[in-house]
Amino acid sequence: MKYLILLAVLGTAFAQRNGFCRLPADEGICKALIPRFYFNTETGKCTMFSYGGCGGNENNFETIEDCQKACGAPERVSDFEGADFKTGCEPAADSGSCAGQLERWFYNVRSGECETFVYGGCGGNDNNYESEEECELVCKNM
């Protein structure tokens, strides 16, 4: 009986802590274009969306790593969005169509290294990573 109570308490605590992961992406009521991540329950992955800067809900993370810690990390390299080498590693760096100034990483096929570039916050291509580690995990292991 004590075992069942413990399981019920732990299950309730876990569900409350991560219940926000089931919320849909919510850009909020303001009009900024801030790149953020939310946990997409349909794909089971953290996905980028544009946040307006105010309002919204708790399924809103500054980095893909924060989203994965809270809601679930991919189990394999191929679980990353854009993990296909041809689309996720071969294209040249693309700053996109917005005017943000975000430091990102891309895989440079000529040098065989992950390098920094400035991302505008929207558009671009899949060769766009939050960190050098993520870039290397996806592109150097293929």
Swiss-Prot record:
It is found in: Secreted. The N-terminus is blocked. Disulfide bonds join 21-71, 30-54, 46-67, 89-139, 98-122, 114-135. Residues 1-15 form the signal peptide. GO terms for biological process: envenomation resulting in negative regulation of voltage-gated potassium channel activity in another organism. Keywords: Blood coagulation cascade inhibiting toxin, Disulfide bond, Hemostasis impairing toxin, Protease inhibitor, Pyrrolidone carboxylic acid, Repeat, Secreted, Serine protease inhibitor, Signal, Toxin. Expressed in the midgut. One of its GO terms (molecular function) is toxin activity. The keyword Cell membrane does not apply. Pfam families: Kunitz_BPTI. The keyword Signal applies. Residues 21-71, 89-139 form the BPTI/Kunitz inhibitor domain. One of its GO terms (cellular component) is extracellular space. CDD domains: Kunitz_boophilin_1-like, Kunitz_boophilin_2-like. The modification Pyrrolidone carboxylic acid is found at residue 16. Midgut thrombin inhibitor that plays a major role in keeping the midgut microenvironment at low hemostatic and inflammatory tonus. Also inhibits FXIa (F11), kallikrein (KLK1), neutrophil elastase (ELANE) and cathepsin G (CTSG), which play a role in the contact pathway of the coagulation cascade. Also abrogates platelet aggregation by cathepsin G and plasmin, and attenuates tissue factor (F3) pathway inhibitor cleavage by elastase. In vivo, inhibits thrombosis and promotes bleeding in mice. Interacts with host thrombin and trypsin. PANTHER family: BPTI_KUNITZ INHIBITOR DOMAIN-CONTAINING PROTEIN, KUNITZ-TYPE PROTEASE INHIBITOR-RELATED. This is Boophilin-G2.
